[in-house]
């Protein structure tokens, strides 16, 4: 007997997801840049096909080299939609594979607390303090991902994200090395993977 696509009207859902990678990323990296933070994602859907998504979080990145140390610290917000690509054969199926889009913004503070110089002008071993400043950034994202129900109402998720910077404020003398929620803006684009755990209410 051939399986039939489930045509029963599916109930809507509200799902809260927590990013698994951001809180521990800095502990497993030996790179000069140490990143930490957290992120939560809220999904709302009426029919398991179109999901309205709101994501919010904070990131802090400390970058240390021989000549200077800089910190980028701030909040970010994303809003958009996911479209489920799955066709269900059983109304109990809740796994999804989706594509999506986001519009995103971040407000953050950039600090250069230590700028070490050895020169005939500044003297040997002098430290110059550059005042901190507040910045904003706006970008768009494309998303491809999946969420799989591992036990009732509990989901593990992963998604691949590509982002394009639309605008960010910057001082010409001191380049921003990290935008919270985006990454390094110097090339104008960013690509990364998110892993999350979520609960359906």
Please provide the spans of the model-predicted regions.
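Outer-membrane beta-barrel transmembrane domain signature
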Residues: 96, 102-201
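Gram-negative (and chloroplast) outer-membrane scaffold detector with strong preference
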Residues: 50, 55-122, 197-199
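Short loop/turn motifs that connect adjacent beta-strands in outer-membrane beta-barrel proteins
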Residues: 4-13, 49, 87-95, 150-156
């Amino acid at each position: 007997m051939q399986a039939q696509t489930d045509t029963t009207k599916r109930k809507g859902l509200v799902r809260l997801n927590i990013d698994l990678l951001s809180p521990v990323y800095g502990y497993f990296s030996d790179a000069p840049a140490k990143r930490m933070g957290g992120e939560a994602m809220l999904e709302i859907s009426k029919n398991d096909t179109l999901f309205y998504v709101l994501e919010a979080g904070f990131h802090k990145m400390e970058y240390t080299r021989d000549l200077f140390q800089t910190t980028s610290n701030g909040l970010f917000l994303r809003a958009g939609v996911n479209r489920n690509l799955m066709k269900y054969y059983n109304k109990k199926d809740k796994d999804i594979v989706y594509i999506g889009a986001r519009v995103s913004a971040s407000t953050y503070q950039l600090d250069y607390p230590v700028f070490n110089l050895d020169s005939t002008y500044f003297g040997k071993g002098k430290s110059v303090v550059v005042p901190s400043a507040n910045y904003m950034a706006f970008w768009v994202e494309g998303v491809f991902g999946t969420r799989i129900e591992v036990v009732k109402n509990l989901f593990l998720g992963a998604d691949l994200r590509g982002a394009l910077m639309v605008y960010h404020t910057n001082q010409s003398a001191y380049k921003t090395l990290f935008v919270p929620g985006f990454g390094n803006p110097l090339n104008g684009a960013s690509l990364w993977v998110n892993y999350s755990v979520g609960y359906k209410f």
